[in-house]
Amino acid sequence: MREGIHPAYAPVVFRDRAANHAFLTRSTMTSEKTVEWTDGHTYPVVDVEISNVSHPFYTGTARVLDTAGRVERFERRYGKGS
């Protein structure tokens, strides 16, 4: 790889404030804020609004919004799937 054209790739802590969960990974993102991780090292921390811990799809709390009865109409026409 050519020198000087690639962004810095380093360990970063991503923190989901809604779920009170944090995870350490590598990223090109950085931050002025830092946090001390469980291994005793200090890493930049990036606060995110939603992650796999708090997203409804991954937590199993997702709901199908059916405003016009389309799911019921489909099930009446073609029957329920097995």
Swiss-Prot record:
Membrane as UniProt keyword: no
Matches recorded under InterPro entries: Ribosomal_bL28/bL31-like_sf, Ribosomal_bL31, Ribosomal_bL31_B, Ribosomal_bL31_sf
Disulfide-bonded cysteines: none
Any one GO biological process: translation
Domain of life: Bacteria
PANTHER family found in the cross-reference section: 50S RIBOSOMAL PROTEIN L31, CHLOROPLASTIC, LARGE RIBOSOMAL SUBUNIT PROTEIN BL31C
Assembly: Part of the 50S ribosomal subunit.
Name of this chain's protein: Large ribosomal subunit protein bL31B-2
Species whose genome carries this gene: Streptomyces avermitilis (strain ATCC 31267 / DSM 46492 / JCM 5070 / NBRC 14893 / NCIMB 12804 / NRRL 8165 / MA-4680)
